[in-house]
Amino acid sequence: MANLHLLTVEILTAALGLGLLALGLLVPHSDRRGIAYVATAGLAGILAAAFGMREASGVVLGGYVIDPFGTYFKILFLVAAMLTAACSYDYVEKMGLNQGEYYALLVLATLGMMVLASSGELVSLYLGLELMTITFCILAAFHLGDAKSAEAGIKYVLLGAMSSAIFLYGLSLVYGSSGTTVIREIGQAVATRGASPALLLGTIFILAGFAFKVTAVPFHMWSPDVYEGAPTPVTGFLSVASKAAAFAALVRVFFGALPDLHSFWVQLFIALAVLTIVLGNLVAIPQTNIKRLLAYSSIAQAGYLLLGIVSFSVLGVGAVMYYAMLYVFGNMGAFMAATAFYNNDGSDEIKDYAGLARRSPLVAALMLFSLLSLAGIPPMAGFVGKFYLFMSIISRQYIWLAILGILMSMVSVYYYLLVAKAMYLGNPPEGSKPLRVAPGLQVAMVVSLLILFILGIYPTPLTNYAMNSAVTFFMP
């Protein structure tokens, strides 16, 4: 019980989520814009608390692990949630959505991701996964009266339920084979008893469940439709934060519980990475809707992150952590630009972005440089992230995988530049007006743009933080 202070971040997040629900019921409709500000300020305060605990370590309640690895991801989730809240102000009002419920679900999804990232035990890991999934199911269908949003919610519920069942069955097989639900103890049991057929089957099922959450091929089919139909800010949050949470849990399970099966599962990860990188990039080329293009781009980015898992090293885990943080600003930047455009023109079609640079230089610049960062073009921050990912697999002699990743990154430049071509070389429609962007969204956009440049030119502070956190994860 003495270690309960280590749960400060989670307790504050839960309190904020419940408080926002209460405010949604108590605050008059005309004053509900204030709920958005409370959510953003609350997340900022929790972010400060998480940063202050970045070196804290300990185990709470027998299986909940507080360590620099988990805290790094909590900081990532909070940053993503703040950016999502900032770009939701106008969107939520325009769509007539319930602000209290919307921001409460956003915060509770963040709580689920925190639990997922710090779980050192299978039951709490599953509970965190379900809290995250259920809140995202509601958020995906939150745009009432919109058929695509309803379709997105239904697809996410049905396919999410199926993946959760597969994942839970895998957990039960691993528990039956090891006799414990504590991740470190599972690793000790596997090292002592060896691999049984049930354990290998459970490993495959767990990997399939994680693959659904990170949108790895062939478990990706839900993401383009869900991303297109969900509210745009939610799509950005879903594509970034939930993926990072799944990777955090994936590292804990496969590196903590199943390291002795590395020679077995690494082949599965290689196959997933290759399929995900290739299909994600190739299918993105013909897309005409910006959210679908970013959905397939997000699939490809998951493939690059899988390369860090394949390397099975401190460098690989550190590279995953570093790239995941950059991915927040790159992908969220693109979705913030898409949100600003949708708030004004009500369209997500790339052809309608024609002449955007003349209507809003800031929105066009954020979209352009976010996409260039995702492509890994220097001096953007994404270049440094991909450099570390490729170096991690080259150090393990997977040179062909690095070459494939570089070639597919070159392919991604093509479809990203199709968006840039429309924005900078196209002509805006006659009578079109300059885009009106809310002050809060403008601040978030400028911050994202600056961070993409700063971390591309001077990445040392974040690389050191990510690598040091990865080192502590491998300590006994």
UniProtKB/Swiss-Prot annotation:
The chain crosses the membrane at residues 7-27, 33-53, 59-79, 100-120, 122-142, 156-176, 199-219, 237-257, 265-285, 305-325, 363-383, 399-419, 437-457. It is found in: Cell membrane. It is a multi-pass membrane protein. Keywords: Cell membrane, Membrane, NAD, Quinone, Translocase, Transmembrane, Transmembrane helix, Transport. GO terms for molecular function: NADH dehydrogenase (ubiquinone) activity; NADH:ubiquinone reductase (non-electrogenic) activity; quinone binding. Its EC number is 7.1.1.-. It catalyses: a quinone + NADH + 5 H(+)(in) = a quinol + NAD(+) + 4 H(+)(out). GO terms for biological process: ATP synthesis coupled electron transport. GO terms for cellular component: plasma membrane. NDH-1 is composed of 14 different subunits. Subunits NuoA, H, J, K, L, M, N constitute the membrane sector of the complex. NDH-1 shuttles electrons from NADH, via FMN and iron-sulfur (Fe-S) centers, to quinones in the respiratory chain. The immediate electron acceptor for the enzyme in this species is believed to be a menaquinone. Couples the redox reaction to proton translocation (for every two electrons transferred, four hydrogen ions are translocated across the cytoplasmic membrane), and thus conserves the redox energy in a proton gradient. PANTHER family: NADH DEHYDROGENASE. Belongs to the complex I subunit 2 family. NCBIfam families: NDH_I_N. This is NADH-quinone oxidoreductase subunit N.
